[in-house]
Each structure stands twice: as C-alpha cells, then as structure tokens.
C-alpha cells in the first residue's frame, strides 16, 4: 500500500543521507552536517525527520529546504545543499539534464512513480478508478510556483504545459493540502500520500501519463 511504499522510498533517501553523514564524520568533523533542497514531496520531509530521529544523540546541523526547481539546482551547484530531490520525465529530462551538467551535478534515481491526481475525497471524481486529462478540464489546477524560472520544464507537476482555464499557484504544501481538502481542485504528483494527507484525500492514477523518475542530484565533486 502507499504507506509501505512511502517507508521504502524514505529509507532510500535516508541511506543517501547516512552516507553523506558518514563522510563528514570520517573527515573528523565533530558536528554532522546535512543540507537537502527538494521539490515539495511529503516523503522527503518524512525521510528527513527519520534522519533527525536517528541522529538525535549526535551533534548535527541539518537543513531541509522545500523550494523551486531552479533553486534546487543552484543550491547543489553552490554547495549550499548536499543533495537536491526532484523528478525527471520524458518532457523535462533533456532540459534539466543540461542544467544539471552546467551545475556540474549528476542525477541519481530513487524510484519511478505513476502520475496520480490528488483530490478531496468529496470531489466528484474521487470514486473513479482512473482519470484522464479530459476529466480534469472543468476543475481548478493547483501547482507550485517556480519563481523567475517559471518554465514548463521546471514545473513540479507533469503536463504543466497543457492550458488550463483556472490555475492557482502556491509555494507551500500546507496551502496545497488545505485547498485540496476544501475545494474541488486537483494537483498531479507521485501518488504517495503522506500521513498529513491521508485524511480527506484521494489519489487516483492518471491514464496515459509519463513515468516520473524521482531521484536526487549531487555535485560531481561530492562522493557519497
């Protein structure tokens, strides 16, 4: 189920963090440091919390930034973050891979996800076993703003290039969750519902959608 999958995905992120933490400890640094920049994925935050829990008896300085795609790349480029968590698909891969190369960073896959539609459990479409893009046309689309790099290729949601008559852009997951629960809008994501989103939410597969390759980027000068 989604809960089991979430734990599996979180463990993969934690393993990467563990390797980074060990590298700092081997170098004789008395305080472990880990900085992560990520798109707005709840499983990333839950994995980060797991890292904090596992290190609670150690000295550490941890940073978790949920931010735009361009800022993730810039943070990794400038060594402000050890890793950056984001996704690739057939639409954005060429452009983002070039941006990674320009930043001297490489993409490492964590898992593949089928695109899902997130809606309120009271949404008219909530009981459907599968949805199409045509089914979503009458409803408001929610997406995360991308700042000055508001290119379709940098969007956190698949199919961002498809026109929509009603769009709401937000910058935090809390607002997104409130909008989804209280209104008949939707967003597209990996389909992994975190604990904070389990209540009042439905996750429905989207037909004929590209695979989301979720992973992390790391500067080429860093070696886990």
What residue ranges belong to the model's regions?
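Secondary-structure junction motif
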Residues: 44-50, 93, 125, 129-162
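Beta-alpha-beta core module
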Residues: 95, 102-108, 113, 174-223
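N-terminal winged-helix
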Residues: 22, 29-74, 223
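Hydrophobic residues within well-ordered alpha-helices
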Residues: 3, 76-77, 136, 177-182, ...
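Alpha-helical "hinge/linker" immediately C-terminal to small N-terminal DNA-binding modules
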Residues: 1-26
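Flexible hinge/capping segments at coil-to-helix
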Residues: 99-141
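Short, well-ordered beta-strand segments
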Residues: 33-39, 84, 118, 142, ...
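Hydrophobic hinge/microswitch elements
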Residues: 77-81, 87, 146-202
